[in-house]
């Protein structure tokens, strides 16, 4: 998997969409700050520089749209597992939000690249490590 580390970006998901043709089958982009982070249904993801883990993963090897949407569940459960290993008790507000002590600390946004068939899946994760 190719790793791309950036200081600042509009959106890690949007970056992967723009660069799709130039990237290998799997890629991950991280940024210290996003200027236009977003969640589902166009909700704004507020973030401050160096206070969040911001990353998006590109997987080009999806061919069925129904499999692509399972990535939300997989990513959400993976973050819960990571937090559990650090003894942080978190809960899931399905389908894509993670809470600790009643505060949202993580959002996951899965998007597809269609042209016109499914060409890839992008999984964006924003984790507020200071909440």
Which residue stretches match the model-derived regions?
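N-terminal lobe of the biotin/lipoate ligase/transferase fold
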Residues: 1-88, 106
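Acidic (Asp/Glu) carboxylate-rich active-site/surface patches
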Residues: 81-116, 126
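Solvent-exposed residues in well-ordered beta-strands and their adjoining turns
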Residues: 58-62, 111, 128-130
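Short glycine- and Lys/Arg-enriched binding-loop motifs that mark or flank ligand-binding interfaces
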Residues: 33-38, 98, 103, 120-122
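Asparagine-centered polar/low-complexity signal
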Residues: 13, 52, 96, 128-131
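Short, acidic (Asp/Glu-rich) active-site segment that either coordinates a divalent metal cofactor
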Residues: 117-131
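Short, glycine/acidic-enriched loop or turn micro-motifs at the edges of active sites
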Residues: 10, 35-36, 100, 127-129
